[in-house]
UniProtKB/Swiss-Prot annotation:
One of its GO terms (biological process) is signal transduction. This is Serine/threonine-protein phosphatase 2A 56 kDa regulatory subunit alpha isoform. Disulfide bonds: none annotated. It comes from Mus musculus. Coiled coil: none annotated. Residues 22-52 are annotated as: Disordered. It holds the Pfam family B56. Widely expressed with highest levels in thymus and ovary.
Length: 486
């Protein structure tokens, strides 16, 4: 049985008179109006369907025989929606609904035996009526989550209480999933997941907790929830490149992954490699990278054999033009190295440290600094020491060159400390590499001098030929002139 459809929508705020007159209002003016408004509503109602609420008796004052019927009446009363974009309309009814929702939250939280089978339908109907709606497009088409303030839901005074009631309902000792599954089904969950695209971070925070509770209590919905999150992420990566609730969904996934049974199913491994790793290419990575990295590390703690393909995947998608992303990638690599098995480290040390060597050489000091901080990690240092014969030859040239040439003195100081540490790990190899590096530099200088000499000779030869050509031309002209004179 699917969840009931929400009631008719509530009326939207009218377009301003200035915008009616001039459809091409200057962008700066429209932006100022948006910033001033800062609230939006996705719930609308036609002007002809005004509803006035009347207060019902308090549940605590009703007899035990009357309470259940009164409880259902209050749930039905709370299905009425109001236009919060109009701050002066329906004030009395809005306050009655707010007080009723508060009473329902307290009633479900403090009383046992109130969530009976007959109430489930009205409870889910009230929740659906209030929270399920089509989210409006962003007020700001150029909305940047990292810089711009989000548009907050104007009807939050009511919606917040509905979410609180929903959570108390799910967490109640009287809650029975076997009954609730008739109403909280795949359609209900699909609508819930769509709400994660809300711009309001308060709503997404409630949704995160609600979905996590549903995942925990409804075993039959778990595979469906994972599949739908997978679909949202794939659309985000390959189609829309925009979804407000990515961080919250990843946070839920982190907890889900932590509970995966071993050995991991093929579908879970595929999700890691085909969805989570490609998500590192997203433009707004900074908004959800912490949660994404946590999910990746959770997978590696479950199955260490995934370490090699994960690191190779990160190296494949390594940022080439965004230093901020490089710093994030380096942070994630350190988190992975914190949990890596020594046997797995040997498989990826060469390609990984080639990339770290490039980062150390970066002219962007934050990238170089973040890469050099690896040498402050005791466990990573122990892995480097065990494999110094492979790692030192990869890193040496970059480190030695930076110690002489980098523009940032902080980086130079860090490099000296790293070189000192590496020298203590294997002094003989360090000396051999120093000698080889200096000899190579001498050879390069010699080749450079030879190239310069060659170019000099070529220029002289070219000049000589030009002079000869000029002389020949002059001689020919002289011969023609003398012949003409005769």
């Amino acid at each position: 049985m699917s969840s009931p459809s929400p009631p008719a929508p509530v009326a939207c705020a009218a377009i301003s008179a200035s915008e009616k007159v001039d459809g091409f209002t200057r962008k700066s003016v429209r932006k100022a109006q948006r910033q001033k408004r800062s609230q939006g509503s996705s719930q609308f109602r036609s002007q002809g369907s005004q509803a006035e609420l009347h207060p019902l008796p308090q549940l605590k004052d009703a007899t035990s025989n009357e309470q259940q019927e009164l409880f259902c009446q209050k749930l039905q009363q709370c299905c009425v929606l109001f236009d919060f974009m109009d701050s002066v309309s329906d004030l009395k009814s809005k306050e009655i609904k707010r007080a009723t929702l508060n009473e329902l939250v307290e009633y479900v939280s403090t009383n046992r035996g109130v969530i009976v089978e007959s109430a489930y339908s009205d409870i889910v109907k009230m929740i659906s009526a209030n929270i399920f709606r089509t989210l409006p497009p962003s007020d700001n088409p150029d909305f940047d989550p990292e810089e711009d303030e989000p548009t907050l839901e104007a009807s939050w005074p009511h919606i917040q209480l509905v979410y609180e009631f929903f959570l108390r309902f799910l967490e109640s000792p009287d809650f029975q999933p076997s009954i609730a599954k008739r109403y909280i089904d795949q359609k209900f969950v699909q609508q819930l997941l769509e709400l994660f695209d809300s711009e309001d971070p308060r709503e997404r925070d409630f949704l995160k907790t609600v979905l996590h509770r549903i995942y925990g209590k409804f075993l039959g919905l778990r595979a469906f929830i994972r599949k739908q999150i997978n679909n949202i992420f794939l659309r985000f990566i390959y189609e829309t490149e925009h979804f407000n609730g990515v961080a919250e969904l990843l946070e839920i996934l982190g907890s889900i992954i932590n509970g995966f049974a071993l050995p991991l199913k093929a579908e879970h491994k595929q999700f890691l490699m085909k969805v989570l790793i490609p998500m590192h290419t997203a433009k707004g990575l900074a908004l959800f990278h912490a949660q994404l990295a946590y999910c990746v590390v959770q997978f590696l703690e479950k199955d260490t054999t995934l370490t090699e393909p994960v690191i190779r995947g990160l190296l494949k998608f390594w940022p080439k033009t965004c230093s901020q992303k490089e710093v994030m990638f380096l942070g994630e690599i350190e988190e992975i190295l914190d949990v890596i098995e020594p046997t797995q480290f040997k498989k990826i040390e060469e390609p990984l440290f080639k990339q770290i060597s490039k980062c150390v050489s970066s002219s962007h000091f934050q990238v170089a600094e973040r890469a050099l901080y690896f040498w402050n990690n005791e466990y990573i240092l122990s892995l480097i020491e065990e494999n110094i014969d492979k790692i030192l030859p990869i890193m040496f040239a970059s480190l030695y060159k930076i110690s002489k040439e980098h523009w940032n003195q902080t980086i130079v100081a860090l490099v000296y400390n790293v070189l000192k540490t590496l020298m203590e790990m294997n002094g003989k190899l360090f000396d051999d590499l120093t000698s080889s590096y200096k000899a190579e530099r001498q050879r390069e200088k010699k080749k450079e001098l030879e190239r310069e000499e060659l170019w000099k000779k070529l220029e002289e030869l070219q000049l000589k030929k030009a002079l000869e050509k000029q002389n020949n031309a002059y001689n020919m002209h002289s011969i023609r002139s003398s012949t003409s004179a005769k």
